[in-house]
């Protein structure tokens, strides 16, 4: 009788893949127009000069340049804005 009794079945044991959100290009990095800067849910980061925002709140570069993160205050809350500065302007700053 070399039989093995059936083991119980688990009702857990599954997981969904991560959605790969987060900052993709950091301050001081060079970017090309169209590069994705941040994937996010809602506006954790706000678009500044040279940055566009997609339907899903993805921030992307509109121009070639250098990424700059800036903290600012609005309604007594500290928020973060992301700019893409042209290479000449970034060198001067």
Curated annotation (Swiss-Prot):
Source organism, top-level taxon: Bacteria
GO-annotated molecular function: structural constituent of ribosome
Region named Disordered: 1-26
GO CC terms: cytosolic large ribosomal subunit
InterPro entries associated with the record: Ribosomal_bL27
Keyword terms: Ribonucleoprotein, Ribosomal protein
UniProt similarity note: Belongs to the bacterial ribosomal protein bL27 family.
The name this protein goes by in its record: Large ribosomal subunit protein bL27
Organism lineage: Bacteria, Pseudomonadati, Thermodesulfobacteriota, Desulfovibrionia, Desulfovibrionales
Gene (name only): rpmA
């Amino acid at each position: 009788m070399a039989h093995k009794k059936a083991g119980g079945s688990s009702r857990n044991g599954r997981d969904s893949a991560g959605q790969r959100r987060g900052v993709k290009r950091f301050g001081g990095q060079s970017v090309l127009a169209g590069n994705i800067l941040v994937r996010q849910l809602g506006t954790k980061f706000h678009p500044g000069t040279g940055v566009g925002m997609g339907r899903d709140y993805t921030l992307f570069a509109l121009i070639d340049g250098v990424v700059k993160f800036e903290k600012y205050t609005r309604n007594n809350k500290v928020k973060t804005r992301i700019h893409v500065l042209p290479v000449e302007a970034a060198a001067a700053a």
